[in-house]
Amino acid sequence: MSDKQENLVTSEEGKAHIRLSRWARFIIFVCFFIIHLLNCSDGGVVSARSNQIKEELQINDKSFGIYGSIVQIGRIIGTLSVMILLNLFDRKYLIFFALLLKCATFLIYFFTTNYFVIMAFRFLQGFSHVFTYVYFPTWVDQFGFQNYKTIMTSFIQTASPFGSVFGFNATTFLGDYKYGFALLAFTILPLDFILLFMPDKYFSPKIFFYKTIKEDHDGRESVFSLFEVDEEKMKQKQAEKEKKPEGPSIWLQLLRPVFATIVLARTVLMFSFMGTHYWIGDYFQNVLGQDGKLAKASVYSVVSLVGPFTGSMAGAAVCEKVGGYTKRASSLLCCGFSILTGICAVLIPMTNDMMVFTVELFLFFFFANCMMPILIGISFNCVDKKLKGASYGVNSLMCTFLGNLPAPSVYGFINDKYKDTNPKMAMACNLNYIWVNTILIALNFHFRKGENIEVKEVEETELKAIEENKE
């Protein structure tokens, strides 16, 4: 029931039910948010104790890279199957068992150090992560407070950076990655059981409405009963409304240079992000010689949290000043940010001083994240209006397949080969890959010139047709 409907309720019985409903939804939201934050903390745990993990599992850098990539494979498979499973099974119990599986993948390290068993559980860790990752925003859209859904959605976006920082800092101070994973598992478990005992109606896709009739003694509307809309009928109506978009497929849009270049540019950006975040703890210890808890925790917190957040805000603000991402100048602005990011990428491997390294890495993430909202906006602007929603899905899928998935492994292969002769080689390659991003954005700027001409011609044709109709 929406907040607007709730405001119409005047009976004491109805108000009591609404208060209970609001508290229940608030508790579920808090539980989901904390769980989502903890689910995003595993990357920080691994990064904080990379040397210990390699020693206990008896693996080299190459295998440690695969150890990171296998989680991304699990997430891809999970993403392809999660919506089917959520529609086939009861959502509350599916989320419950997915979180139990997630906790099991965190605790497996206490029982075995066999690399192949661990890799199987790492795959399941990525697979189980997807269920709350996909369902949480959906739940907010359906059951969130009407006037606060935007704020609630914004909180969801903060879970990933805050979770990563929490996992890194907690594990750094605990001193053992197994304790870091155990902390995540034993915090998720009670929250999982709280969700299990919440009423089913707050997880079901069925939509509830309050039936109101004017029979109160003072003429006001009162709540008498609760009825629910049949789920099958709702699905049929939804299917009737949804029609396939006319025109070319979203996949064919990748053949258009203006769209392909911007998607690949964001993919390159995600590749550098993922490789740096996954291996930064290893770089602290083995290259910079920073084993101090406070130094590592402070640098990771500043770089992973403050840099991306302030960069995204600054990039969006500057883009608005030049007319927004619909203007061709936004590609030129993005190219400028990419060059500044590339300069930082060149300087970082040359630095041995921890303070200078922190500043350079902060600026790298700051300027790189200045591009992120602009790149997403440009990708929307480069496709037909009917394909804008699908464009983000394709964009994200390409970023996962070509960015997040290979990044840890590629870094590991390079580091395993050159760490004895040049321990900075892998980080230098990972960071300076950003120059490919600069080339792609410059090409996008070139191709958008033709796009603007086409749009102008279409607009002139439409205006001419309108004038003819008026006559």
Regions found by a protein language model. Give the residues of each.
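Extracytoplasmic
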Residues: 27-61, 276-281
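Conserved MFS/SLC helix-loop-helix module at the cytosolic interface between two early adjacent transmembrane helices
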Residues: 77-115
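Structural signature of the two symmetry-related core transmembrane helices
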Residues: 93-107, 329-346
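Cytoplasmic helix-loop-helix junction between adjacent transmembrane helices
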Residues: 121-160
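Glycine-rich segments within core transmembrane alpha-helices of 12-TM secondary carriers
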Residues: 148-175, 304-312, 396-408
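Symmetry-related core transmembrane helices of the 12-TM Major Facilitator Superfamily/SLC fold
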Residues: 179-197, 425-444
